[in-house]
UniProtKB/Swiss-Prot annotation:
It comes from the Bacteria. Signal peptide: none annotated. It is found in: Cytoplasm. This is Mlc titration factor A. Binds 1 zinc ion per subunit. The lineage of its organism: Bacteria, Pseudomonadati, Pseudomonadota, Gammaproteobacteria, Enterobacterales. InterPro entries: MetalloPept_cat_dom_sf, MtfA_enterob, MtfA_fam, MtfA_N. Keywords: Aminopeptidase, Cytoplasm, Hydrolase, Metal-binding, Metalloprotease, Protease, Zinc. It comes from Escherichia coli (strain SE11). The gene is mtfA. One of its GO terms (cellular component) is cytosol. NCBIfam families: PRK15410.1 (NF011939). Its cofactor is Zn(2+). It holds the Pfam family Peptidase_M90. Involved in the modulation of the activity of the glucose-phosphotransferase system (glucose-PTS). Interacts with the transcriptional repressor Mlc, preventing its interaction with DNA and leading to the modulation of expression of genes regulated by Mlc, including ptsG, which encodes the PTS system glucose-specific EIICB component.
Length: 265
């Protein structure tokens, strides 16, 4: 059982929060005890600073709140919670939701249509999610709705539109853009060869640089074994930006599991 270092100082309300149960999802089991402790500390602050708003009858209990907060804080585990300063509310639907979408075509005509969305991240507003897809984000499959939307927030942290280039030193931007576009082209080539459904990386990553950064951020944390060997140069840039190495965590966990298995009699 993990001994949490903050328990001496936490309030009665915080003590009641089911952090250990919340940490039991597959995505977070690769973290060391020290990393889990740090993540929970950030998640506690997240719940103090942000407002989780359930919509359309969705029931938000303490376990769900904790797991949502943990997933929000995983990408900023080493960056710091201030990287999530760009919003104050998280709106949560029970399932994918319908929105009115307005877009302009190449000749300037404005079109309106109703579309189904899994999530949204407004540059100067809230993050919008749905619980069905949040639940599907608990495993290590390459899909993670919360990390996807957080990546968009990190992308626009410098105040500009999402470009696929997060807030990094100016000298690194050209290299980042080169590697990101190379990854997009590679993903598009696979799509043309085998089709969207059979592609090993979500085809949405090939749609534009901002979505490529968000989708690959999902794979960075939840399927590093697919990301790292395929795009090694971009992988290193992601490791440097997020200041984390999920592939190393995965290898460490696998080594521990193998060692435990060889010692079972």
């Amino acid at each position: 059982m993990i001994k949490w270092p903050w328990k001496v100082q936490e309030s009665a309300h915080q003590t009641a929060l089911p952090w250990q149960e919340a940490l039991s999802i597959p995505l977070l089991t690769c973290l060391t005890e020290q990393e889990q402790s740090k993540l929970v500390t950030l998640a506690e602050r997240f719940l103090q600073q942000k407002r989780l708003v359930p919509l359309q009858g969705f029931e938000l209990d303490s376990l769900r709140s904790c797991r949502i907060a943990l997933l929000f804080c995983l990408p900023v585990l080493e960056l710091g919670l201030e990287w999530l300063d760009g919003f104050h509310e998280v709106l949560i639907y029970p399932a994918p939701f319908v929105v009115d979408d307005e877009w302009e075509d190449d000749i300037g005509l404005v079109h309106n249509q109703r579309i189904v969305q899994s999530g949204q991240s407004w540059q100067q507003g809230p993050i919008v999610l749905n619980w069905l897809d949040i639940q599907d984000s608990f495993d290590a499959s390459g899909f993670n709705l919360i990390i996807h939307e957080v990546a968009h927030k990190l992308d626009t942290r410098n105040g500009d539109r999402a470009s696929g280039v997060p807030f990094i030193p100016l000298r690194e931007v050209a290299g980042w853009e080169h590697d990101l576009h190379a990854a997009m082209n590679n993903i598009q080539e696979e799509i043309e060869l085998v089709g969207e459904n059979a592609a090993s990386i979500d085809a949405y990553a090939a749609s534009d640089p901002a979505e490529c950064f968000a989708v690959l951020s999902e794979y960075f944390f939840s399927a590093p074994e697919l990301f790292a060997p395929r795009f090694p140069s971009l992988w290193q840039r992601f490791c440097q930006f997020y200041q984390q190495d999920p592939l190393q965590r995965l290898h460490r966990t696998n080594d521990t599991d193998s060692f435990s298995a060889t010692n079972v009699h």
